[in-house]
UniProtKB/Swiss-Prot annotation:
PANTHER family: NUCLEOLAR PROTEIN 9
CC terms in the record's Gene Ontology section: 90S preribosome; nucleolus; preribosome, small subunit precursor
The protein, known as: Nucleolar protein 9
Compositionally biased intervals (Polar residues): 677-689
Family as reported in the entry's similarity comment: Belongs to the NOP9 family.
Species of provenance: Paracoccidioides lutzii (strain ATCC MYA-826 / Pb01) (Paracoccidioides brasiliensis)
Region (Disordered): 1-39, 477-496, 670-689
Matching InterPro entries: ARM-like, ARM-type_fold, NOP9, Pumilio_RNA-bd_rpt
Keywords: Nucleus, Repeat, Ribosome biogenesis, rRNA processing
Origin superkingdom: Eukaryota
UniProt-annotated location(s): Nucleus, Nucleolus
GO molecular function: RNA binding
Gene name tied to this protein: NOP9
Database matches in Gene3D superfamilies: Leucine-rich Repeat Variant (1.25.10.10)
SUPFAM superfamilies: ARM repeat
Length: 689
């Protein structure tokens, strides 16, 4: 079929016409003013208008709207990756050498801080540097981040650097505040050229984020930073187990321990914060929820990203701002639960009941139970929980909320709750859901509730046979299979085995039938099974507690230690068994002949113990060097006549002090303001006949 006749060069002519239209200056001006909204990216628009000219002082913006700070070249990546490896190995000879190395890395990173923070391969170096930095280095880095926090907190890698920076800077805010107050008392004028205080740097960072709280609340990475900021402003502990779970997930890797940095112990305690922090906290909390209606706020309760932020908001509101804040109509708690009387079929009661069974919302309910005012909790327990606590205990998710509820009950309420939970104990034992039972035992010990009915129920659930009882409780059949080589890894433990071990440890803390259930089972098993228990990393804690807790009677300790005779050296060379050997030292405090027999076993295997890391620890904890050289001193320690950690050999042997000891004593006495130390022997004046 003949083709249609077409003119040659039509495409080139059409392209030439388009180029003529674009290069027309009048068209360019109209396009710049009217069609600017068609460009989703401002930098792309400037690139089209200015041709190949890109201003060097302006940052590029990628298609997602976040700033792009550039990439490290290959040499820089290799250098910083090598520095990260050296910091993680932490094989510096002295702290001074480590400080010099960190300062050199900071010098090399000068001007590249934002690139490093946003780098997938080098952002971990930034976290390690922050963990090992001094306060001046943290201030310097904080100042480099100022002006970029809105983009950094939303970045996948830089957000972790921001969290690390805030956490480590928070521990210096209190010390700076104390120094500032002491200077004011002394009426000292501060240098006008001095660097900004961390207090001011924090406030600048918060001011950058203002106006964006609404979408940052549910942003995947920025929400973590918001939680940290709330806790820092409130002065709450940042390394407390109760707050760590809401700051980051369980998979969060804390790099401070890897670089050998010891965090200030005050970071795990409540901090004193400046007055400006309290004002900034109130404004931040108000801005976070002002634009949200009650329906959206309740939806956040089951939102996987927004829920942890809501937990921190509630915790800070109820614990930091006082219980009276809950009465405020604009408070987070009152907006979530507006019904003050909690009617059975009301909207608030329905909302709270739904949180019990939601895997995300139940965590918010735990926070409400922990921190809510007493009046609200009593009403909540009476209307919603009291008659349903048995059914709540059956559910795997609601059981965690029940544990928090049991922690706040009085003795009478705890007794009635236990009566309702007892019928659910056998099915809970069968499915290895033991957290509620463990909480009942622990709270019963604290409140002084009779735990006899619970012991009888556990006896019927686990069976009368002592051997099968301990096997079912600690899941020893699984451990035996691992020892036979049928399991790929013997170091991993199942949740059922862990929960059974924790339940047995709680039972050992109770005097009476609960403790006897575990002790009788440990005495009934064969010595081989007892050794396997001692060598298991999870269930060995049961044997350690059975030996050392006050509920352990001399008769029980005498029987259990005799079954370990001949196996002490084997246990001392095992990573888990060595802890059992350490527990045998206080367990045989009134059984000196047993302790001497164990010491003889250790002496026979001295070479093997000294060649092993855990063996050397056992040798040191048992003071075996003293046993070989000064048997009398060792026996005095073994009987508890002397401190086991530090032996005063001068007292034991009546050895007089040397001249250097006397000189040290005189120097210490002069430092304390006295002329002569009290224990300095008086000089004898020769008498003339």
């Amino acid at each position: 079929m003949p083709r249609e006749k077409q003119k040659r060069g039509r495409r080139a002519e059409a392209k030439r016409k388009r180029d003529d239209v674009i290069t027309d200056p009048t068209v360019l001006k109209r396009q710049k003013s009217s069609d600017v909204s068609n460009y989703p990216n401002r930098s792309y628009e400037q690139l089209e208008i200015r041709g190949d000219y890109i201003p060097l002082d302006e940052e590029l913006v990628d298609s997602t709207g976040t700033a792009f700070y550039g990439l490290l070249d290959i040499e820089e990546q290799e250098y910083f990756s090598h520095a990260s490896g050296l910091l993680e190995l932490n094989q510096f000879e002295t702290e001074e050498e480590k400080s010099i190395f960190i300062e050199r890395v900071y010098e090399e990173a000068n001007g590249k801080e934002l690139k490093i923070a946003c780098s997938q391969s080098c952002s971990r170096l930034m976290e390690k540097l922050i963990s090992a930095s001094t306060v001046s280095q943290i201030k310097r880095l904080f100042s480099k981040f100022i002006g970029h926090f809105l983009d950094l907190v939303q970045h996948r890698f830089a957000s972790h650097c921001c969290e690390c920076l805030f956490i480590h800077a928070a521990q210096y805010v209190t010390s700076e505040m104390k120094k500032k107050s002491s200077k004011e008392k002394e009426n000292l004028e501060e240098d006008s050229t001095s660097e900004l205080q961390l207090e001011d740097l924090f406030l600048k960072a918060i001011s950058e984020l203002e106006g964006n709280w609404g979408y940052l609340l549910t942003e995947r990475f920025a929400s973590h930073t918001i939680r940290v900021l709330l806790l820092v402003l409130a002065g709450k502990p940042l390394r407390n187990p109760s707050t760590t779970t809401v700051i980051a997930s369980r998979k969060k890797e804390y790099l401070a321990s890897k670089v050998g940095t010891q965090l200030d112990p005050s970071i795990s305690e409540k901090q004193a914060v400046p007055t400006s922090f309290n004002k900034a906290l109130e404004k931040m909390m108000k801005d976070l929820v002002t634009g949200l209606d009650n329906t959206y706020l309740r939806a956040l309760a089951t939102h996987p990203v927004g829920n942890p932020v809501l937990q921190v908001l509630l915790s800070v509101e109820l614990s930091h701002m006082g219980k009276s804040k809950a009465k405020d109509a604009d408070s987070v708690l009152r907006r979530l639960v507006p019904d003050e009387n909690l009617q059975e079929d009301g909207e608030s009661a329905t909302f709270l009941k739904g949180l019990f069974y939601d895997p995300v919302g139940s965590r918010l309910l735990e926070t409400i139970v922990q921190d809510a005012p007493g009046k609200f909790f009593k009403l909540f327990y009476k209307i919603i929980v009291r008659e349903r606590i048995g059914s709540f205990s059956r559910n795997e998710i609601a059981g965690h909320v029940v544990v928090r509820i049991l922690e706040r009950l009085s003795k009478e309420d705890l007794k009635s709750a236990m009566d309702l939970i007892l019928p659910e104990v056998p099915p809970l034992v069968e499915r290895s859901r033991l957290t509620v039972i463990k909480a009942l035992i622990e709270r019963g010990i604290v409140r002084g509730v009779d735990l006899g009915p619970l012991a009888a129920t556990l006896l019927s659930a686990y069976g009368d046979d002592a051997v099968s009882r301990i096997n079912n409780m600690l899941k020893l059949q699984r451990s035996n299979k691992e020892n036979d080589g049928t399991t790929s890894s013997s170091n991993t433990s199942s949740p059922e085995q862990l929960h059974g071990s924790l339940l047995a440890q709680a039972m050992l803390k109770s005097t009476g039938p609960l403790c006897e259930l575990v002790q009788s089972s440990l005495l009934a098993v064969t010595p081989e099974t007892l050794i396997s228990i001692a060598q298991d990393p999870v269930v060995s804690h049961v044997l350690q507690d059975a030996l050392t807790l006050p509920t352990s009677t001399p008769q029980f300790r005498r029987q259990i230690t005799s079954r370990l005779s001949g196996k002490i050296a084997e246990l001392a060379l095992h990573s888990s068994g060595s802890h059992v050997v350490d527990a045998l030292w206080p367990a045989t405090r009134d059984l000196i002949f047993v302790k001497q027999r164990f010491a003889e076993e250790l002496v026979v295997h001295e070479r093997a113990l000294r060649d092993s890391f855990v063996g050397r620890a056992v040798w040191r904890n048992w003071s075996m060097d003293l046993y070989k050289r000064k048997r009398g001193s060792w026996i005095a320690i073994a009987k508890g006549l002397e401190d086991s950690a530090e032996v005063n050999l001068n007292t034991l042997t009546n050895k007089p002090k040397s001249n250097i000891d006397l000189a040290r004593a005189r120097f210490a006495a002069k430092a304390n303001g006295s002329k002569e130390p009290a224990n300095t022997p008086s000089k004898k004046i020769p008498t003339t006949s």
